[in-house]
Amino acid sequence: DDVALYFSGQEWEILEKWQKQMYKQEMKTNYQTLDSLGYAFSKPDLITWMEQGRMLFISEQGCLDKTRRTTSPPTDEQLDMKDTGKLPCFDHEGTLRTKEEDCRLNGPQKQDLGAALPGKERKILSARRDTFQSPSLQETEIPNKKVSITASDPDKKDLRHKPRETPGRLEIPTGPRCYSCYVCRKVFQVRRDLLKHKRSHSKSQLRRYPKYRNTSRGKSELRRTQRLLCQKKRFQCSECEKSYFLKGSLVTHQVVHTGQRPYPCPECDKTFRYRANLKKHLCLHRGERPFCCGECGRAFVQQCELTEHLRLHSGEKPFQCPQCDRCFRLKRGMKVHLSQHSGKRPFHCPECGRSFSRKAALKTHQRTHSEEKPFSCDECGRKFIYKIKLDEHIRVHTGEKPFSCPECNKSFRLKRSLKAHGLQHSGKRPFQCPECSRGFFWRNAMRAHQRLHSEQKPFPCAECGKRFTRPSKLACHTRVHDRQKEFPCGECKKTFSQQSRLTQHLKVHNTEKPFSCAECGRSFRRRAHLTEHTRLHSGEEPFQCPECDKSFSWKASMKFHQRMHRDEKPFACSECGKTYTHQSQLTEHLRLHSGEKPYQCPECQKTFRLKGNLKSHLLQHSGQKPFSCVMCGKSFTQQYRLTEHIRVHSGEKPFQCPECDKSYCIRGSLKVHLYTHSGERPFQCPECGKGFLQKRSLKAHLCLHSGERPFSCDECGRSFTYVGALKTHIAVHAKEKPSSL
């Protein structure tokens, strides 16, 4: 193809300094090359201009043509160079020629030149001799350069040719057509991408360039900008008083207030405010997700969604807060964050008056008042207000724990649990009470603690008027009043607060239990559960703690125990500040403050705070004592009672007093002993003020005031206040029986 490269005055101004230097060097190199080959021609004007330091651009009236292809260095007989009006142009090898060198070849020289070329090249040359002399040229564009092609060759009229690159010479792009940004020189293969990229430049940047000002778009935009700068935002929304320059922008905005959704989905009847949103939604029904992540394979409907997702892998956070320099991955995340600095919360809940910075957050909050729970679990049927809560709940069924601690490789189901765990490694408690400077891992725990200082209890019970600091405590308390409203199990009389939990519980009774224990006859649905149960009878403890060599029957018990070595107690009581290693321990502890006793004995209606206490109590009614000592045959209702009893035979006393080095086999005995050193008597009689070390001593003392004698002899019917007195009395009857015989 025939290409002639030249620079106009405007283009010469756009060129960078290094590009101008390269152009000058290229021109000098080409001139020296021709001169060394012995060509007879006068010095071109371009070289003269460079020596004189003049501007090196060509007026747009100048006509530059492309030369023939160079085969071998021509001789003086083949070319007779004229010294008329030399203008620079390039062949496909990048060699400098002049218009007369290539266009004004005399008759015999033309024949010699044609003879020196191959047949194909000779045909091309003969077909285009008239073209080189023709002044009628048509211009088209490639990025930042102008290319002249011959109008007399109709087959090549729309062809955009880019010569191949030559080392050390001016580079002209090759391959498919490219589109260049004239502000930053970035190149794009698709015109649409270039238009999108231009939006990243401010209008002030674009208006600096003559090429932009000369385009119709630039002129219209300049006129529009000047018009907008000279006028105010005349179109104001009557609802929120927001103003706009254009009426069309106001009409688009008002759809938000009217609630109008004129674009319905034909598949699911969902409606949309804008047609573009409907088109995106239809891609979901068609299953079209054309934008795929190369890292994890996840597919998206829109390119912008993929772009946002890729920042997860790259860690890029391009949006920075101007107030605190905090960075965000998404622009909307930064907008939400900015509302914290401004303090603006324009969206108010009509039910409770709570304010929100986003309308979407208000809508989600209103579900708490309407009790709408649109997200349900397919496994257990439990429903949730928020989708993120459903996603977290599903991990309970799948067992997935995607958040791993880099320090100890421990995994967590929730990200916030990992954050709280990480604070234990660092020892930081980021939330401090301003009153007493006490630290907390959680903001909610600190807020609940602050209510203790202010004595604020904003949550009253509707039945009895008792007030609580937290809604969770109120919920626990209301169970006492609502026991008749609970859902009881017809098989075992167990009650549940929700129908879904009762349904889940009924599966225990309805399913078969083919695996039975040979010792006690208890049945299980799974063999693994039976295996774990038999360890109670055999005393097998296969799981050993690597820290203290203590053994356990279950792996979960060992993990639970290991937290004690790590001093890991992430669950804190907001009332008294006591910490626990497990959530269930905290739940049981909170019942001390609320006074709740949710477990009731069906035989005597006695209530208990802990489920384990109820189970032990039921064994008294049934008379069962499943845990027997192999040494003396004594039986116990609970495992820990047997463990304490075995220490009597072994002589083990693991609990030692730090004051007097006295040792005990039971932890409770050590606690009572420590009161003797401190002088504390925690259990006081409300009648006479007398103090006692143990609770059972106080109960026995209260019988003196009430006159009650709960312990009676079966032989003679005599009653006693203390169980010890009854045992002494029974021994008297035992001694009398042999003598009477």
From Swiss-Prot:
Keywords: Cytoplasm, DNA-binding, Metal-binding, Nucleus, Repeat, Transcription, Transcription regulation, Zinc, Zinc-finger. It comes from the Eukaryota. GO terms for molecular function: DNA binding; zinc ion binding. GO terms for biological process: negative regulation of DNA-templated transcription. The keyword Glycoprotein does not apply. Residues 67-86, 128-169 are annotated as: Disordered. Belongs to the krueppel C2H2-type zinc-finger protein family. This is Zinc finger protein 425. It comes from Macaca fascicularis. The lineage of its organism: Eukaryota, Metazoa, Chordata, Craniata, Vertebrata.
